[in-house]
Regions:
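Hydrophobic small-molecule pocket/channel-lining residues, especially in calycin-type beta-barrels
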Residues: 2-6, 18-277
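Sec-dependent N-terminal signal peptides
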Residues: 7-15
């Protein structure tokens, strides 16, 4: 019995020592205070640092077609019209609030949007996974590191790189397209305003084959300290858009298909009990 007790005490001591070591390793005071609810500040379109998106001629034509489609009431290839996730970097630009949770190995960004989007930013020093070992996702795979820029022993900036992104995606609701080759790389610097700690910035630079050169954009959010409210929203509850073939249609309140633009051809309804209108 004494031997068993000794083993148990030793195991407990080891567990407590490990817990204490982890707690010591994660010194919360070293990290910026990014707790709370953050809400976007400014217009929904990207605030470009170095001018409009430098699209290649091919993808400028795609963008022009998206804009024309949206002018006529269509979705302009914006994925959220079809209940698909916004993906990176559009998910960092939406109107719904976000929350940042910092842990020693992972920083989570939780976004209170359709189907509750989230990001995992690994800060444990890992390498990139082989492309064959990782399925592309809309949020991509993000690796980051905390940086002490002013040398005061505290972290100021979270530097992030994101790869392995799934298509289709657009930069924002204006329909600026990404290349569909899955080779997009996104680099970010996330940091608090030095003068106002209730303001946070996300400097984003995108490397993409739809661009003639990297494109830098800046986003700003403010901490909601008064009465932060969170909601859960399921896309299927509010979705009024369906895609049949390559064409989108609205769903009316009584379940009928409606056109999304003038003179739109009706879909093939031979298998449905609905007449063409």
């Amino acid at each position: 019995m004494g031997y068993r007790s000794s083993i148990g005490v030793t195991a407990l001591a080891a567990a407590l020592a490990m817990t204490f070591a982890v707690a010591q390793a994660f010194d919360d005071a070293k990290y910026p205070d990014m707790k709370g609810q953050w809400n976007r500040v400014g217009p929904p379109n990207w605030q470009a640092v170095n001018g409009p998106a430098p699209l290649t001629p091919e993808y400028q034509a795609v963008y022009n077609a998206n804009r024309a489609d949206m002018t006529n009431g269509g979705p302009g290839d914006v994925p959220s019209w079809y209940c698909l996730p916004q993906g990176m970097p559009m998910m960092m630009n939406i109107y719904d609030p976000m929350e940042i949770v910092i842990t020693p190995d992972i920083t989570y960004i939780l976004i209170s949007h359709v189907n509750d989007s989230y990001r995992r930013i690994y800060t444990d020093g890992r390498d990139w996974p082989a492309e064959d070992d990782y399925e592309l996702t809309y949020a991509g795979y993000s690796i980051g590191k905390w940086v002490d820029e002013d040398g005061d022993g505290k972290y100021d900036v979270l530097e992030v790189e994101t790869r392995l992104l799934k298509s289709p995606r657009t930069y924002d609701a204006s329909g600026i397209p990404f290349h569909k080759d899955g080779k997009t790389v996104i680099k970010e610097r996330i940091y608090l305003d030095k003068a106002d700690k209730n303001v946070i910035y996300d400097d984003i630079t995108v490397f993409d084959n739809a661009l003639t050169k990297p494109w830098s954009i800046k986003k700003k959010a403010a901490r909601n300290a008064k009465r932060p409210l969170w909601r859960t929203e399921a896309c299927a509850e509010d979705n009024a858009m369906v895609k049949i073939g390559n064409d989108p249609y609205f769903l009316s309140a009584d379940g009928k298909l409606m056109p999304t633009r003038p003179n739109q051809e009706p879909p093939d309804l031979r298998y449905f009990n609905q007449s063409k209108k």
